[in-house]
Amino acid sequence: MAKISRLFGSTVKAAITAQAGFHGKRIPAVSSLQEHIVKSTPARYNSTQACLENDISGTDNKGFKGHDMLAPFTAGWQSTDVDPLIIEKSEGSHVYDMQGRKYIDTLAGLWCTALGGNEPRLVDAATKQLNTLPFYHSFWNRTTKPSLDLAKELLDMFTAKKMAKAFFTNSGSEANDTQVKLVWYYNNALGRPNKKKFIARAKAYHGSTLISASLTGLPALHQNFDLPAPFVLHTDCPHYWRYHLPGETEEEFSTRLAKNLEDLILKEGPETIAAFIAEPVMGAGGVIPPPATYFDKIQAVVKKYDILFIADEVICAFGRLGTMFGSDMYNIKPDLVTLAKALSSAYMPIGAVLVSPEVSDVIHSQSNKLGSFSHGFTYSGHPVACAVALEAIKIYKERNMVERVNRISPKFQEGLKAFSDSPIIGEIRGLGLILATEFANNKSPNDHFPPEWGVGAYFGAQCQKNGMLVRVAGDTIMMSPPFVVTPEELDELIRIYGKALRETEKRVEELKSQK
């Protein structure tokens, strides 16, 4: 083992700081095949870190080891023993560290800087609003014009199903917490006090606050936090490559998952199930596009039992998939919608909840009875955040960003999927400007590389060494470049990916020879 550990350089440590992979305890209501894989991942994650920890010896001490931040999604040893990668400047699709090194930011920050790192119109919008009205709240029927304008804009542009009201938050996590409170408020108003349970999916990501982390189907967000909350259930992840049965078609797979969902509803009692929440394409769980008819079948089930459908569009909205919203891509007709990230291109923290007339009318009536709708945040509808979001939406429309994504995404998708024949790649999946590579031994979803090899972390380190940042989660690599990425930058991205892959193939071959 020590011999294998020495094969890993200190650059791997920098790559694994981005990990928030698939690890943890059993998720309820997951099929036995999926359960086996979910339960097998904690050892993979932990032993990879243990192996890498043996070689924490960065050569260029920048003086920030043991810094003062309790860093999100970061292991303690990383903060104490490894200098963080400190990003100082951004331009377009690139970011620069404190030493002036330039990187292609293939994850657009965290799936969010859709307009790149230095869009002057967004800076100007923020500056103008700061000079006019830097803050005012939206409580007690007092508010600001940017928040009213943004609410109208969002309601007008979401066309998958008519929406009637918008509620503003500071993040996707807060927005999904709000969704739960709205649904409970709604069912209480209708005299259904027992209809309170939520169904999410294994490998889903819906946030990291108390309730949104419970909805999330990545057990690392539950472990030692006493989560998930008891009112949250999880059903199957729609990842066909990994979870289909032998000989099962995508259509049959989707039918089985819909049947499993219905069985779960019947087991719990339809009168207890309030809502189903789903990302159109799963993001942090590994970029998992569903089979073509999956959402049609799922929606039929939830509608049958009077269960609300919440579309978590935090990653997919505003063009990421090649449609303005992910709901447009998959014919989803949600009752509630969650937005954040690209809403402001991440230049200001802001999230939103869109509420259908059927739900908002009930909430309106109930708030009249109670004298108030007693939910909100100090910064709900912050005028600066709303002004920036309004300008971002103007840019998306004026520059035809959806059309642009459709124009450049074939180069991105086809250029990377051309590497699918690599002996260490199990699957490359994605659409639009979002993609994942999953490494697998013998190209099989059921044949993992030994966890101590850290194949994904090594690939990520090679990318970083060559001027590109990717997201590493176990042996899955995720990418979602800014919408403004150029064809030339995509050529460079593909070149670095290929170089990192060749180095990783060599490393895997070397490790196999040590067994």
UniProtKB/Swiss-Prot annotation:
It is an enzyme of class 2 (transferase). Expressed in leaves, roots, stems, flowers and fruits. Substrate binds at Y205, K341. It comes from the Eukaryota. Signal peptide: none annotated. InterPro entries: Aminotrans_3, Aminotrans_3_PPA_site, PyrdxlP-dep_Trfase, PyrdxlP-dep_Trfase_major, PyrdxlP-dep_Trfase_small. Its EC number is 2.6.1.96. It is found in: Mitochondrion. PROSITE patterns: AA_TRANSFER_CLASS_3. One of its GO terms (cellular component) is mitochondrion. Disulfide bonds: none annotated. Keywords: Aminotransferase, Mitochondrion, Pyridoxal phosphate, Transferase, Transit peptide. It catalyses: 4-aminobutanoate + pyruvate = succinate semialdehyde + L-alanine; 4-aminobutanoate + glyoxylate = succinate semialdehyde + glycine. Belongs to the class-III pyridoxal-phosphate-dependent aminotransferase family. Transaminase that degrades gamma-amino butyric acid (GABA) and uses pyruvate or glyoxylate as amino-group acceptor. Cannot use beta-alanine, ornithine, acetylornithine, serine, glycine, asparagine, glutamine, glutamate, valine, leucine, isoleucine, methionine, phenylalanine, histidine, lysine, arginine, aspartate, threonine, tyrosine, tryptophan, proline, or cysteine as amino donors. Acts predominantly in vegetative tissues. This is Gamma aminobutyrate transaminase 1, mitochondrial. It comes from Solanum lycopersicum.
